[in-house]
Amino acid sequence: MMKCLSLQSKMILYVAIGALFAFMGGIVYYSTLDIPELEKSEIELYSVEVIEVNNFENYISLKNTFLIKNFGEKTVTVPVISYEFFANGKFIGTSNFSAEDIPLTGRALLISGTEVPFTTKIKIDLTEENENEYMKIANGEHVDYSADGLYTIETAWQVIDVEFEN
């Protein structure tokens, strides 16, 4: 009788462990269902504003606004935007936006069908390589700005990095 009870206890333990692994696998599978929704976002360099031109220390501060659109059905957040910044096609610096230190519930929400602006600042130092673009920006001349980089977009279940160029 004791041997039979021991075998039954082992079977219950094995079934419980198997059920636990099946449950964990189901959670992983469910989380991957968000990936197509995360890929339905789009980022655009919306505006660039000159904040400060410091002729004494030879730098310019710019405020860049990125507009992120959510075309998916799920509500998402954007914790990180990292990018290289170009003026007239010439590299002039890098910058980033980060909300990683803010809990997921406190970040800007991109509800389905919405557009949300994210603002960053970039400091451009005068160098020999960027002198022409620097002077055009400082003098208020027309400059075509662009940015290439990576942004992270996430739901409560999944996180992906998306590359962008614009």
Feature names for model-found ranges:
Residues 58-65, 139:
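Short, solvent-exposed loop/turn segments enriched in Ser/Thr/Gly
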Residues 66-72:
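Asparagine-centered strand-capping/turn motif at beta-strand->loop junctions
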Residues 74-82, 94-95:
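Short, hydrophobic/aromatic beta-strand segments
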Residues 123-166:
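Terminal connector regions
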